[in-house]
Amino acid sequence: MLLEYLQAALRHAHYEILKDDGTYYGEIPECRGVYANAATLEACREELREVLEEWVLFRVHQNLTLPVIDSIELTIKEVA
């Protein structure tokens, strides 16, 4: 389920080439604060994936909600 969520989120990524320095900028609008900047598109995609993974883990650790993406809802259940 986690892998499916990450893949779905990455499909929502938007990329652009920054005019001032020609680097690539990528973000996932549904995941506030998840963005990356790199010299190549592939490096930007890889960095964005890493940032997304860290963002999800941080939110889970802090018991914060995650946005539903493509009908995928990650919820953490408390175990006794």
Can you name each region flagged by the protein language model?
Residues 11, 24, 34-36:
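Structural detector for hydrophobic anchor residues on beta-strands
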Residues 27, 34, 64:
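Gly/Ser/Thr-rich helix-start
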Residues 16-29:
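Short aromatic-glycine-(Arg/Gly/Cys) micro-motifs in beta-strand/loop hairpins
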Residues 32-42:
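A short, exposed loop/beta-hairpin motif centered on an aromatic-Gly-Thr core
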Residues 1-14, 21, 46-80:
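Short, charged, surface-exposed hinge/linker loops at domain edges
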